[in-house]
């Protein structure tokens, strides 16, 4: 076959259905990066804008309060401007108090979060265990009298366990949490006897076993369960016994502070009263010293007077 005829032939020598065949006129499907080609830049992560702090700054509020107080101390401030600044001062002080309470509340939540979690876990297990036991007793073939007696005892225990659970959940978040359960190691006697509890909370025991030993908040939670005000108690919107105790402690502290101030004032008054006495004593000493000097002079003059009455004379005016 001549060479020219071979050039004029179509390059398509394979069926078009062959997927491995590619016409040279088509662009390549796979793009190979050459060594000199620049790589695409790395796509940066999209950073979302930070959420604005919705709570006011304590330092900013304190600064505003100081500025308003300085402004109110001015004598030439107009009456209408003074009224506006007094209202602004009351609002700033209220905002500052609320912000400090919120920060104290969040601090207490972080501090006692893990203790509350452990107590809630243990109390929920106790409730489930007693509920299972109650179902078993109710479905057992016991005498009616014995069954009622056991069910009554279980109902009492279940009520206490539910109060314990609500205590761990609805304890006021802004107050110091008092734990109900203590992490106690198993005694050696239990290990020797080989008593293996099915539950994992065998090492946790109730600190306040009797109702009399329980904290005052436990009885408050029990009362709130009847009234249906547990949410209000958790948010600190109810007045409970512990808050009253806190107010009493604060009042005692205030009384101590006032007594200290009174004692300091009394000391100052005594100091001021003692100083003039000392001055008077000094004056008295000076007067005594002056008088003693005069007395000494008079005594010397008296001692010298008999000598002057002698025969010798200096030749006076009336002397003959």
UniProtKB/Swiss-Prot annotation:
- Coiled-coil stretches: 57-111, 145-166
User: What family is it from?
Assistant: Belongs to the EFG1 family.
What job does this protein perform?
Involved in rRNA processing.
For this entry, the protein name equals rRNA-processing protein efg1
| Keyword annotations from UniProtKB, A to Z | Coiled coil, Nucleus, rRNA processing
Q: Where is the composition biased (Basic and acidic residues)?
A: 16-28, 247-270, 277-298
Q: Which Pfam families match?
A: Efg1
Record's GO cellular component terms: nucleolus; preribosome, small subunit precursor
GO terms classed as biological process: maturation of SSU-rRNA from tricistronic rRNA transcript (SSU-rRNA, 5.8S rRNA, LSU-rRNA)
Q: Name the residues that span the membrane.
A: none
Task: Give the residue ranges for region: Disordered.
Answer: 1-59, 241-320
Where does this protein reside within or beyond the cell?
Answer: Nucleus, Nucleolus
């Amino acid at each position: 076959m001549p060479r020219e005829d071979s050039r004029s032939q179509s390059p398509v020598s394979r069926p078009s259905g062959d997927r491995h065949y590619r016409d040279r006129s088509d662009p390549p499907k796979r793009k190979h990066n050459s060594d000199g080609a620049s790589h695409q830049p790395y796509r940066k992560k999209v950073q979302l804008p930070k959420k604005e702090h919705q709570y006011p700054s304590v330092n900013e509020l304190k600064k505003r309060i100081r500025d308003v107080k300085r402004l109110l101390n001015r004598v030439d401030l107009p009456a209408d401007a003074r009224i506006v600044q007094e209202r602004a001062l009351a609002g700033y002080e209220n905002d500052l108090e609320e912000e400090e309470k919120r920060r104290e509340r969040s601090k207490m939540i972080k501090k006692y979060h893990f203790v509350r979690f452990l107590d809630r876990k243990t109390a929920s297990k106790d409730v489930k265990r007693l509920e299972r036991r109650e179902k078993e007793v109710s479905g057992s073939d016991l005498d009616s009298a014995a069954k009622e007696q056991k069910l009554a005892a279980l109902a009492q225990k279940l009520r206490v366990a539910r109060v314990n659970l609500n205590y761990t959940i609805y304890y006021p978040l802004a107050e110091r949490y008092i734990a109900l359960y203590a992490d106690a190691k198993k005694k050696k006697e239990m290990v020797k006897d080989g008593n293996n509890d099915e539950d994992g909370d065998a090492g946790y025991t109730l600190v306040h076993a009797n109702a009399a030993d329980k904290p005052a908040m436990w009885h408050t939670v029990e009362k709130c369960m009847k009234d249906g005000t547990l949410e209000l108690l958790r948010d600190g919107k109810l007045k409970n016994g512990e808050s009253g105790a806190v107010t009493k402690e604060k009042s005692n502290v205030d009384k101590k502070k006032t007594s200290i101030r009174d004692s300091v004032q009394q000391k100052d008054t005594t100091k001021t009263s003692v100083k003039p006495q000392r001055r008077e004593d000094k004056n008295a000493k000076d007067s005594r010293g002056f008088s003693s000097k005069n007395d000494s002079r008079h005594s010397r003059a008296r001692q010298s007077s008999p000598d002057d009455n002698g025969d010798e004379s200096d030749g006076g005016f009336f002397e003959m």
